[in-house]
Amino acid sequence: MSSGGLLLLLGLLTLWAELTPISGQDRPKKPGLCPPRPQKPPCVRECKNDWRCPGEQKCCRYGCIYECRDPIFVK
């Protein structure tokens, strides 16, 4: 395969990996709220949505930071 073909394949794979699966769009969000913003380096992306986090954890957004966190519940 030529280098141009490899670059095209790599680009398509990158776009495919960034797309949210259609099957996950209709899922409800997990209960609870995200806790206060953590002290982390800028723009860390551990997850894309709640269903990419283990157990009860939620995918929490803090600016450009996305990470799996245990939810908090407010009464």
From Swiss-Prot:
PROSITE patterns: WAP
Tissue: Expressed by the venom gland.
GO biological process, one term: venom-mediated disruption of cell wall in another organism
Disulfide bonds, paired cysteine numbers: C34-C60, C43-C64, C47-C59, C53-C68
Signal peptide: 1-24
GO CC field: extracellular region; extracellular space
Localisation per UniProt entry: Secreted
Domain WAP, residue spans: 27-72
SUPFAM superfamilies: Elafin-like
Keywords: Antibiotic, Antimicrobial, Disulfide bond, Secreted, Signal
A Pfam family: WAP
Gene Ontology molecular function terms on file: serine-type endopeptidase inhibitor activity
Function according to Swiss-Prot or TrEMBL: Damages membranes of susceptible bacteria. Has no hemolytic activity. Not toxic to mice. Does not inhibit the proteinases elastase and cathepsin G.
Family membership noted in the UniProt record: Belongs to the venom waprin family.
Protein name per its UniProtKB record: Carwaprin-a
